[in-house]
């Protein structure tokens, strides 16, 4: 593990320096896709660094080059695209893409960024380098956790098969737009769990946060009350056939009876955040603010409001532009993209950062055999592979063609 590297230090520095914000109209474009690939590489390298305990150059590079605010703006931009543009795009009469792979990349982008932020925000200097963007990040986390509470009160957590996150190379060749919308909604559950971790890391810095940041957490959003709601609804726990299951590592796992009295990782994040917000000296001293002070501190411009103001009334125009120029790629473009993703998602790296053993693509049992053709899907036995071929076949052919194109 310690010797495994996806990026050399010089390569990582170049990728970090090149990070920039994109207008909503350019989301899904060639330049945007290139940055998405770069973010995935940085993401995987950051996880490798943290796992190997070798120091974390990705985190240091992001701080040195002042790119944390850029990541926050990109995070909120794609969140807005999913809320404002994506539904309009799916309703267009001529929206009949031959391949939904490019759209999935955009839907997956939010999860990629929040995962990278979760990895690096463990370090206090990252929170400090976010500057004013930390306010927007707090707003973002508040939105995600509010939706998580609302979802758990409506009908509980998503099912096992709904929570499985896929790499782009595991995505089907063609998925109906309605199915893509469903996948985007289901992905919100894991995104919210990452947002909780990021918020907890921000509260770790409560003694050094600005007055406006504390005010945003304690007065504007009243985060202590929201965190108590999370503990009450406990959306990351459920009972299936009488057995307690908890959501950890991107999947539902059965908890042994001897382990059921222990706090889950997500429960622990909530309790630590509550401790930081309610018992730290700085938070207690600053909880009560005058109306005048609140009004002054809330005048800080926010990324969400600026992006919405810049694009208000343009959602349909953006959707139509992206339908013509972004989400209708040629077969050659798709094969090129498949080849580039095969290079990005190196199998040795994915196996190194995987939280547990691979699972069978058909029955979800622990798997030891990989598809010999594309090397992307795992199976527990030959019978499961045969049964899954009808669903996996097209994606397998596309991936194999991408490998041969190298």
Residue ranges and their predicted role:
Residues 2-359:
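Extended alpha-helical interaction scaffolds used for oligomerization/partner binding
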Residues 370-397:
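Cys/His-coordinated zinc-finger cores
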């Amino acid at each position: 593990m310690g010797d495994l590297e996806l990026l050399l230090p010089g390569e990582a520095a170049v990728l970090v320096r090149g990070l920039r914000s994109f207008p909503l109209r350019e989301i899904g474009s060639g330049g945007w896709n290139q940055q998405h690939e770069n973010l995935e590489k940085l993401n995987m390298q950051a996880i490798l660094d943290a796992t190997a305990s070798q120091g974390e150059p990705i985190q240091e590079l992001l701080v040195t080059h002042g790119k944390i605010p850029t990541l926050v703006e990109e995070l909120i931009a794609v969140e807005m695209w999913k809320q404002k543009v994506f539904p309009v795009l799916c309703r267009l009469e001529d929206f009949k893409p031959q391949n939904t792979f490019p759209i999935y990349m955009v839907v997956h982008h939010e999860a990629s960024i929040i995962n990278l932020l979760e990895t690096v925000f463990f370090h206090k200097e990252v929170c400090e380098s976010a500057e004013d963007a930390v306010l927007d990040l707090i707003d973002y986390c508040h939105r995600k956790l509010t939706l998580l509470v609302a979802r758990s009160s409506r009908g509980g957590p998503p099912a096992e098969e709904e929570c499985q996150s896929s790499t782009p190379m595991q995505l089907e060749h063609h998925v109906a737009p309605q199915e893509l919308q469903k996948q985007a909604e289901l992905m919100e559950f894991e995104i919210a769990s990452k947002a909780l971790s990021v918020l907890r890391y921000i509260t770790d810095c409560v003694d050094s946060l600005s007055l406006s940041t504390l005010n945003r957490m304690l007065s504007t959003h009243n985060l202590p009350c929201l965190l108590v709601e999370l503990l009450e609804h406990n959306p990351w726990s459920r009972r299936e056939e009488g057995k307690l299951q908890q959501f950890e590592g991107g999947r539902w796992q059965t908890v042994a009876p001897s382990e059921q009295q222990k706090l889950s990782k997500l429960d622990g994040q909530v309790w630590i955040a509550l401790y930081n917000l309610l018992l730290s000296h700085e938070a207690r001293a600053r909880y009560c603010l005058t109306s005048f002070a609140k009004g002054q501190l809330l005048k800080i411009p926010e990324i969400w409001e600026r992006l919405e103001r810049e694009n208000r009334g343009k959602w349909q125009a953006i959707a139509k532009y992206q339908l013509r120029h972004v989400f209708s790629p040629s077969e050659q473009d798709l094969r090129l993209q498949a080849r580039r993703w095969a290079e990005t998602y190196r199998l040795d790296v994915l196996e190194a950062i995987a939280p547990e053993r691979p699972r069978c693509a058909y029955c979800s049992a622990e798997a030891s055999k990989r598809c010999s053709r594309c090397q992307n899907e795992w199976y527990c036995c030959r019978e499961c592979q045969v049964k899954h071929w009808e669903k996996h076949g097209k994606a397998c052919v596309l991936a194999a063609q991408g490998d041969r194109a190298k």
